[in-house]
Amino acid sequence: LQRITVSLDALDDVIFRRMNDVDFAVGDVLRGIEMAQQVGLAPVKINMVVKRGTNDGEILPLARYFRHSGAVLRFIEYMPIGDERTSSHCAVDPHAPALNPELWDASDTVPSDELRARINAGAAAAGLGELEPLDINDAPAGAGPARYWHFPGAAGTVGFISAMSNHFCANCNRLRLTADGNVRPCLFSDAEYSVREALRRGDDMQVLSIWRDAVAHKPQEHAIIEGTQRFMSQIGG
């Protein structure tokens, strides 16, 4: 184990507990992050999924908290994982027909450009300067689809994953293996390829064939607004 990713959607205890449905304090997570850094795991990535009206007030507190930590803070646009619709529209559209409003609505998504502008405005007011793009060669290991920025003179890095407002399908290098043994070539598609039985048999050639088949069937572009049947907790992320 060389690096880890931690989901952290708020520093405020009330928001944290409500969003994660847990009975422990956010301080436990923060201590775990510090311990991971102390034992040499690097990079330590912090993923924050931003939902308008729920935790978007936590954007600046998290940016300030991790600014000098050396951790990689990544803001992720809120996405319709675990619901279905028939439209194939891919961009953020507040006028698009809503999915189940208890699960996802287009107006819940805060686009990365808005996130960055809000961070810059808050940073400027605090005299911290503005985010600057990070050279691709300086991006953290396992950077994947995120686009990275940093504050001048700060140890931390800020990334934005913009699946809704500016999809990155052409550069996607991800496959996912679900807990029940299926290879999923695209997070936003329900297409899956079962590798479980081949793994149980120890059939390495069959496993390799299935993985190659999954790679070959990665879609050219996601249809994210269609939603998916599985939730993230079922897919793994």
Question: How should each PLM-predicted stretch be described?
Answer:
Residues R64, H68, Y78-G237:
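Auxiliary Fe-S-binding modules of radical SAM enzymes
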